[in-house]
């Protein structure tokens, strides 16, 4: 059946900011869906609050509303645009929940908007735990013994009846949020309370634990005529009990018998038919490893993280096909873009193995509880493709960028067998290395399988890898022959791993490979196991025979991607990479992308001329460059992952376009950079590197407190802190030198000024600054965690002139051709430079969208030799728009147990939203709403615990808050000072004192906002840490910067929260 002619204008709801459990996969699926709709001549209206996405670009939708994803604001868009249809399944859990809410509140009926694709009734049957369980019982699909729980007492009673352990699964939440495994009543009370609070309908499913069973997933498609196919099945190497987002996953499944495979496939199709899915659906099963017993865990009646993985693993574009089905097409009418011959009703066939490994953020949260369970904690993931499991798995390990190239990890060498067993039984992000060490020491495979729930098939593969590592370590380079080296390469060993074990350099192994003609061949991902010729140039490396790459003589450029999503290097860099590829293709240049992230738009095979799904290591990148012989490589847009390849590529005489490794060194080496600033007469905060506690204290006395301290070599502000006195500095330096005595600690005078940021473009002669951004929080809060305003609101014309002058001088002196990011501080009327990055930064998507300057496109054309003056955007500072746009960071700390919440010099946010308004107050209010921050709309009781350095400033703000009708609760010191200022304050006892104390008030949700300025962040022994954690875990607003509080006060004084706010189409 062809296109439904009644559908002319479709509203697509995006997924909002990147958070743990909902990452870049929805930018990929949303972009695909929008493009599929536009292909059919349908007008696309997009609502999404996330400015860092490709899907919010003017090329992707006809109208783009970067507005909060709430019923209030989406209704305004519907009222203004009058779409006839709504596509709900492309925006993750956020989009699904919002669609259900719009339906239930009668808004869709009010404006006559039809839901296309999977219906609201089907969504409810998939998402509501009780409806889903009843449906499974009706179609005789086994479910785990369970009960729908809406209050604590009935949960406790049911758990006593079925016995522990039990699993808590909240309804309508994301990534297992609020859920977990409870082994006893005490744990149940804690987990159940959290789950009931965080479920949007106050409902959880309490079920008997089948921890240790295999977890199997099927990705299924169904059209409105009842045609069904399974796109892909996937096997979690980790058993049930670890969230699938935190599990290592392999596709296709490796350990299922044909009977098990067909049994679960049939069950998937029965389920998707019963629920009435129209589009894509993910079905998760628990399978007893010792029998054919299975149970349905849950379904996702939408595109998901798993569907993005299945799309990339097979080449089957699930989101695109789902969008076409929503328009009325049948699977047998939708062409397969990979082959150009077959149709979407053909089930993909895989003749390779795919492995997904999660990327966790624990490097940013040293004190975090790393034990994995039913709550997802990974920020991103990598995918690796190989001709066998071992090859894909080792590619995956080196793709994680954790400095590991094999299964050996030094930290596990000295552990006793008992300690290793504990690390394996309570799995964390490093379990695979502990498990490998157990196998290395000869621990019986059947025993390892028993205690981990990991199938013997995988353990035998790991043991083989470990045994080969041991053989290498007992050998020399002279023992290595062609046959052995070829076997190792076929099983995924990198040159570096082999070299490390033989104690030679990787270049030596590369030389031997060259002599013995051991070069990788590249195979195509074609969806059909080679049965039909494929049109999509989408490749993975193998050391088997037959190469499927056709190398052209065209002018070509390699673009290095940014790898997995992590804190400090998020979706913004994928945005930049994709725009670079688009710009190159417009210029007629063949583009080759290398990346390994299955969630992103850059790894959609339709984006570039060729896609290599490979690790971003020196060897893997060099192999592709050797094969393709490009005219240049672009590193500027792939974040630190790409930039760190600059020196290696220079050594190999491979040309990089834009910034060179020498320019990177000049910007990042402190001494060289200080010399440059001195020559240019540009100020920076005074400071130096110190090697001891005594030297550090002496330097601090010379500079005067407060002092910013940090390790020498850090990314994303890792390990940075502001110290206010000698006691704090001594504490920091003592710990820092204990961790690393081989490198200096950098000590800078901390200037408590206004932070200013620019992304600029230089062609070596002229400089264009698309916009000057102002950070709301003063210097000392990492730029990625600060609220950012454009146009700048509080900067004088003189400072703006200095910003442009310094930017020009730095860009031209460093020799930038392309992009440069500079961060400044304005302190007491003077401008200081604090950081220069000779590459794209995380603010590029934001400033591109709100200034209207296509920054990446221009920077790419400059790298190809064009000049700014010829590109139509002028030079100097670009004209400011009428609307004000505020970028607000979004944090996922609620999902990570025992991690710090407070703002500081180390970045912690995972995503961002945009607020757009006629003035800064309207924009701030929208930003606060979009980021789910406290706005004062629902309650006005503030708990204030303020450090001594901040009390004077807080007292001024509290007077305004008092006038605005806020109530204060505070501990003795702050309460007394509030009363002295004429403000009524209720006194509360400290933690540890008799009830009711601070923690009781938080647990009982008698507080609406916690304002807590930390004395020492990252110190889990302090009361402040526990107050912040307790509040965030109960969805109570927390502000740790008085600048954020001041913004709240200002927008309330201006009445932005009471005003009828417009929504803006940014195209």
Swiss-Prot record:
Q: Where along this sequence does the record place binding of Mn(2+) 2? A: 298, 300
Write out the GO cellular component annotations. cytoplasm
Q: What class of enzyme is it?
A: ligase
Enumerate the spans annotated as MGS-like domain. 933-1067
| Annotated binding of Mg(2+) 3, by residue | 823, 835
> What positions does the entry give for Mn(2+) 3 binding?
823, 835
SUPFAM superfamilies named among the record's database cross-references: Carbamoyl phosphate synthetase, large subunit connection domain, Glutathione synthetase ATP-binding domain-like, Methylglyoxal synthase-like, PreATP-grasp domain
According to the record, the residues making up region (Oligomerization domain) are 402-549
Q: What is known of its domains?
A: The large subunit is composed of 2 ATP-grasp domains that are involved in binding the 2 ATP molecules needed for carbamoyl phosphate synthesis. The N-terminal ATP-grasp domain (referred to as the carboxyphosphate synthetic component) catalyzes the ATP-dependent phosphorylation of hydrogencarbonate to carboxyphosphate and the subsequent nucleophilic attack by ammonia to form a carbamate intermediate.
Record-linked HAMAP family: CPSase_L_chain_A, CPSase_L_chain_B
Family, according to the entry, reads as follows:
Belongs to the CarB family.
According to UniProt, the name of this protein is Carbamoyl phosphate synthase large chain
Can you name the source organism? Clostridium perfringens (strain SM101 / Type A)
Q: Which gene encodes it?
A: carB
